[in-house]
Amino acid sequence: MGMNTSIYRMKNGTLLGVLLCLVALWPSRVCAENSATNPAQMLQKLDESLTQKAQYEQQKLQRIAQLKAQLPRTFDRKRYALLRQLYKEYASYQYDSAYTYAQQMNQMALQLCSQDFHIEAQCAQVFCLLSAGLFHEGVATLQPIDIAHATAPYRKLYFITAARLYYDLADYTHAAPYVGEYIAKGSVFTDSLLHYLPRNSDEWLYASGLQAMKWRHFTASNHYFKQLLSRNHVDAHTRAIITSCMGWTKLFQHEKAAAICLLAQAAIYDNVSATRETTALCTLARLLYEQGDIQRSTEYVRQSLQNANFYGAR
């Protein structure tokens, strides 16, 4: 996942909650206890998980097929809800399909004369664009969104999306003074978002952790992230984002053993949730190459490129 921040896959509902409870809780405990001392153990678990990639993907495709089968006999608000489910299934899986369903959500929102649904559909389009690396188009799509008459949940969604866009833009730019400017913009949107979130809720912890991480307040960010990871109901996709973020902080602090373990854990969660829009595996490959693990590094690069090409990242 991107320093992903999505949240951003953010972030995406709890469709994978049952799967998480069955197969994805143990890595977080292993890594939390042994992240600095057992990277080999986590890499072995990652290799084992990757052998089941086709199985996890088939589960996603079955869910998608079941949703699509309902479309011909579904109308009005129920149809919008179905389009939303299809968008969420594709959001971090395949750009073209995700964007198509985001557009269909927008068309349905206009038919229903729903300002809230219109905002949600526009935010979905922004998420697709930023996930594909189309940042200019993402900003152009975000700017006209009018939340003046939106209800609180959809204002919240707007702030989540805007923060994610500018944080990702900062990661992509890597050049002064723009990095600081984009982080500051993302932080302003995060401050607005936090007003809508109950303190210590899942979303509050994630938003606070991400904001602290972007300002490189790593002790604070990891404190928030660890609290969130300790909650058993958190889905696999969100866990992938959080552990990827924590891996990045350890990498920045030159704690490579801990970074490898956390990134391996993130890659496991990405695999379990059939996420194709991801950076954990690629970053992990680079670290392993530097350590001389050429065979594993080469395989992770191959799979990372396969994921990126399938997703449609630019």
Give the positions of each predicted feature.
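A "functional boundary" signal
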Residues: 2, 7-8, 27-314
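Bacterial N-terminal signal peptides
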Residues: 17-25
